[in-house]
Amino acid sequence: MPTINETAFIAPNATIIGDVEIGDETGIWFGCVIRGDVHEIRIGSRTNIQDLTMVHVAKGKFGTYIGDDVTIGHSAIIHACTLEDRSFVGMGATVMDGCVIEQGGMLGANALLSPGKRIPAGELWAGVPARKVRDLTQEEIEFFKVSADRYADLAQEYVTSIPKDLGKDS
């Protein structure tokens, strides 16, 4: 059974299944699927998982661990991997089994991070398959926290203003 902090925003058409824990002020946006059916998923605080993203696990091998203040762009696939605090995954990107994106690391839009790869702190990776493009500037790394803050604030607006039964059958 999922464990969801009461301050998290879960869009009415998001699906959360199985052994999932979601931290405070986190936003799980419209059309997301968070599927901890065969292993655990842990999502930290003030993280935003944007519209149409799929988060899954690998049976008997890898859970999925997403830290605090993480931004995951629209339509990403996050599969059996670790995203450390204040990491960033661009729209449409795929992170595969056993991968790690370290704190302050970034995977660009539409990139494919192959199984077992690690993006070190402060690096931007992009492409198919993803490779290091360059080091991030301090300003870019600081923006990850700004992005997380903006989405956490938006999640709180939804939590306080959207009826709890929105989108549910009567």
Model-derived features with residue positions:
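Glycine-rich hexapeptide-repeat left-handed beta-helix
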Residues: 1-3, 37-58, 62-66, 74-170
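Short proline/glycine- and basic residue-enriched helix-capping loop/turn segments at helix->loop/beta transitions
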Residues: 71
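N-terminal segments that cap or nucleate solenoid repeat domains
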Residues: 1-28
